[in-house]
Amino acid sequence: FEKVQHKLPMLSLANAFNQNDLEEFIDRIKKYLNLDHREIIKFICEPKIDGLSINLNYENGILISASTRGDGKIGENVTSNVGNIIGIPKRLQGQSYPKQIEIRGEIFLNKKDFIKLNKKIDKKNKFSNPRNAAAGSLRQLNSNITKQRPLKFIAHGIGKCSKEYSTISNFFNDLHK
């Protein structure tokens, strides 16, 4: 696959396993933003979908490229393999989308589809988990194989965008118009 440099880095998520981890994370955010330790920060929380991170680049509402996260700075161009994935529109709906926007999210397989897929594959080629199945399916050189896999997409944020949003909530609200 052709290498693609991201316009803005695609950072990976860190885990918080307990209350202390979460409090340390909040302290780091406040320090980074030069906020008083008493300042209250609002968060949007969402379930962690364990899939393959993807960056979808739209211009004038039309999908022009899709790339994997890779090392966060450079990913792989997988545009030819995302066309039939549930949840990835080739054209954005409505009128409120920005002229240029990168939508970021996860390509994944749900557990039920993962089990079905592994039943169809011979024993030596079975996938060890749904995340590996999603990654292996997306990175097929033969896009017909990718089309046959029940991959799904869920958006969780934006990269480079021609319109500024003060919060991610404002972005999601704007997209629903």
Feature-to-residue mapping (PLM):
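RNA/tRNA-interacting regions in translation and RNA-turnover enzymes
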Residues: 1-177
